[in-house]
Amino acid sequence: QLGSLELALDQSDVFGSCDIGFSCQYTSTISWRDSYTPLPMETNPRAVFERLFGDTGTTDPAVRLQRIRKDRSLLDSVTERVSELNRTVGAGDRAKLDQYLDAVRDVERRIQMAEAQSNRELPQIEQPAGIPNTYEEHAKLMFDMQVLAYQTDLTRVITFMLGRELSGRTYAEIGVPDSHHPTSHHRDDPALYEKVTKINEFHTSLFAYYLDKLDATPDGNGSLLDNILMLYGAGMSDSNRHQNTGLPLVLLGGAGGAVKGGRHLRYTEGTPISNLHLTMLEKMGIPMESIANSTGRLNLLSGV
């Protein structure tokens, strides 16, 4: 089982400083290991498939088990050679090797889990060829990969970025030959406002496709949507003014009955978004004292 998947639709191809002295890394990923370590986001559905099922090109159990055993054999060879090397190097190099061995053991643990799950009946799906030609096809294929990952319990945590900040992607397929960022600074121009609204509605319609897939996929006594907890939104409440407070966010899924939906909740001005993150973790059985700049939990979130 993978600890998490970080996925996106736009390549990260910008470097340096992007906005008011902040690193472009903040535009390229929305998932971080810690305050200083960004997690790279995968954009190729083929690579996502390989990460989930290996490079066999199929979800067939027999083929997957054969590949798993080959991987285990290679890993055993690597571990043996590193252990021999560890006995001959100095303290500094030994520390580096120990760090490497920790990573190897993590891979070994994943192989063991894969072996245990190799007979599980999986949906018959062939490996994607690569990135589709249109944004819509790309988004839907990446959503399909996410449903498959949850359905097979190969991960329980996914971060997905529909669009990179400052991306130059245009949306000709919906009649908008402009990119999202310049149209979001619409300056109350009706033509630009119409364009950015079209893009936002397009993104939301694709997200609705994902929700329908989750709702149609059985999981336990309900569906994946009943048991998932997902946050959908953006980093600006008014992009025209670069206003990043009072964010309009949507929380979806039932978290196994821990969260009641169908409501519009408004919180006190200045409430950190990390309070929401902290509460979401708690609802999914991961209690923490704090996260980032959190000041507490959102007590109104339950309502069940």
Regions found by a protein language model. Give the residues of each.
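Ligand-binding pockets and gating/stacking loops
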Residues: Q1-V304
